[in-house]
Amino acid sequence: MNLDNAIHEAAKVLAGASRAAVFSGAGVSAESGIPTFRDPGGVWDRLNPAEVGDTQGLLASLEKNPEKLVAMFMELLAVFDAAIPNPGHRALFDLERMGILQAVITQNIDNLHQEAGNTQVIEMHGNGFRFRCLKCRSRRSHERHALIGRVKERLSTLPDFSPASIFAAMPDCDLCGSGMRPDVVMFGETVMEVENAFAAARSCDVMLALGTSGVVTPAAQIPAEAKASGAKVIVINPNENGFARVCDIYISMKTGQALPRIVEQVKKIRSGS
């Protein structure tokens, strides 16, 4: 099936849907300028997520070479600060407004789905702009740009980059006064909202797998769960189809290119034009 036909078929499927769900990965955020682990020459080539992705590794790296780690972190902050929702994000909001999309299940922590307007977002890896109390487990969300500005200011005024100094710069809980940490999943930690994600997959009539390779489990099982429950599975990824076993329609394009075209055709189909 060529790309034009695949886009038309995807539009026909979505035009008849009322409970579609999205499963999005790093490829969607990459189109907003946020590098993936695979991007050559990016920050992750110098900041190995396998070394700093868990709590113990992060602490060890801070002890060993704090200046390098903080410099890389500041670079990442600049990347997240500059990112904006791309046409793919905005197309998903269009699908929600049309009553087609019921949930976005995402592995991304950048808050861009919410900023584009989607209201039902299930974050399996957490949110980088939300903090969780280490004691009472309460959560507090922050506006992305304001939080990045405060973090950069605090880091620039620290007496040193020791773990104690850095963690002392974290916000305190409004409820109990204890320390807080970013509400994200580190390597080795339990993925969040698994039950909600799989429930959304089981209840959807169409599953859109966007910009994800289907490698990381248990999240990678979500499209298969949707397929087993009777949903059509549409995969949009320019690099590979990691869900070939369950895929009904594959579109080898970037989501920011494919989704606006699909949504445009959905509108025409629904209007009868």
UniProtKB/Swiss-Prot annotation:
Names of required cofactors: Zn(2+)
InterPro entries linked to this entry: DHS-like_NAD/FAD-binding_dom, NAD-dep_sirtuin_deacylases, Sirtuin, Sirtuin_cat_small_dom_sf, Ssirtuin_cat_dom
Location in the cell: Cytoplasm
Record's cofactor remark: Binds 1 zinc ion per subunit.
Residue sites binding NAD(+) per the record: 25-44, 107-110, 211-213, 237-239, 255
Amino acids binding Zn(2+): C133, C136, C173, C176
Reactions that this protein is recorded to catalyse: N(6)-acetyl-L-lysyl-[protein] + NAD(+) + H2O = 2''-O-acetyl-ADP-D-ribose + nicotinamide + L-lysyl-[protein]
Swiss-Prot/TrEMBL keywords: Cytoplasm, Metal-binding, NAD, Transferase, Zinc
Enzyme class, spelled out: transferase
Protein's name in the database: NAD-dependent protein deacylase
Organism: Desulfosudis oleivorans (strain DSM 6200 / JCM 39069 / Hxd3) (Desulfococcus oleovorans)
Gene from which this protein is expressed: cobB
